[in-house]
Regions:
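Short, solvent-exposed loop/turn segments enriched in Ser/Thr/Gly
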Residues: 210-211
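Phosphate-binding/catalytic loops
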Residues: 147-161
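Active-site beta-strand->loop->alpha-helix modules in alpha/beta enzyme cores, enriched
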Residues: 1-145, 151, 173, 188, ...
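Short coil/turn linker and secondary-structure boundary residues
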Residues: 89, 120, 159-162, 184
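A charged, well-structured terminal subsegment
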Residues: 162-188
Length: 226
């Protein structure tokens, strides 16, 4: 299996754009990967955008972002107020937000939802990510849930056992408002990372997995529009 280092030069600033429809999506989908990258690279800069929240969940999201991004060289967290569950009907307004984001940031890596996610809010964010950012490395993360939409990802980030435990514990501790959901447990998050670890032959037994639709190796590709 070919090993790729997401951050080419740890001494050069590397900007990550993390996008989540809801307040816990980023942490659930790629929290261990973020912790792993921050342990290895001192020059990570983050733009962290959540598109819907309420007063309680916004406080949880801010605390979670602070916890997960500890050690980042730079971090900017934005928590928005689009109507939960109705993202397809708010397409134009959310698209305007994406266009403003594109003018403000030029990330080296974008982490977003999976395009085949059955949650309509997740799917909208994934579609607008690809619609807006045409010259960037985009990895789509997965969210375990009742809808049974987990697929066969093709990009794996091995995670040591301590980091996997740290991610699972932090998600449950940070988002107390979600603990009444039957699936919102440390065991759920560890189980998915364990399964992806098996599928990628991770030495630790744990990994987070993503969908990588387009990766250009070697010389830079011509920019869209040139």
């Amino acid at each position: 299996m070919l090993n790729l280092d997401l951050v080419r030069d740890p001494n050069t600033p590397f900007r990550v754009l993390a996008l989540g429809a809801h307040c816990d999506d980023i942490e659930i989908g790629c929290g261990a990967t973020l912790l792993h990258l921050l342990e290895r690279h001192p020059n990570l800069c983050f733009d962290w955008v959540v598109f819907t929240s309420n007063a309680v969940r916004a406080r949880e999201a801010e605390a979670a972002a602070e916890r997960f991004l500890r050690g980042a060289k730079e971090k900017r967290v934005a928590i928005k107020q689009f109507r939960n569950g109705y993202f397809p009907d708010q397409w134009a307004a959310i698209k305007d937000d994406f266009e403003a984001l594109k003018r403000d940031v030029n990330p080296d890596l974008i982490l977003t939802h999976h395009q085949q996610d059955l949650h309509q809010d997740h799917r909208t964010i994934a579609e607008l990510t690809w619609n807006t950012f045409r010259d960037h490395l985009i990895l789509e993360y997965e969210i375990p849930k009742y809808d049974s939409d987990l697929g066969s990802p093709n990009f794996f980030v091995p995670i040591d056992a301590a980091t996997a435990q740290r991610k699972a514990r932090a998600v449950v501790e940070c988002f107390a408002s979600q603990r009444d959901k039957h699936w919102f447990t440390e065991d759920t998050f560890l189980a998915l990372m364990r399964l992806r670890g098996v599928q990628s032959a991770a030495a630790s037994g744990f990994a987070e997995a993503f969908y990588a639709r387009k990766i250009c190796a070697g010389a830079p590709a011509r920019r869209i529009g040139e």
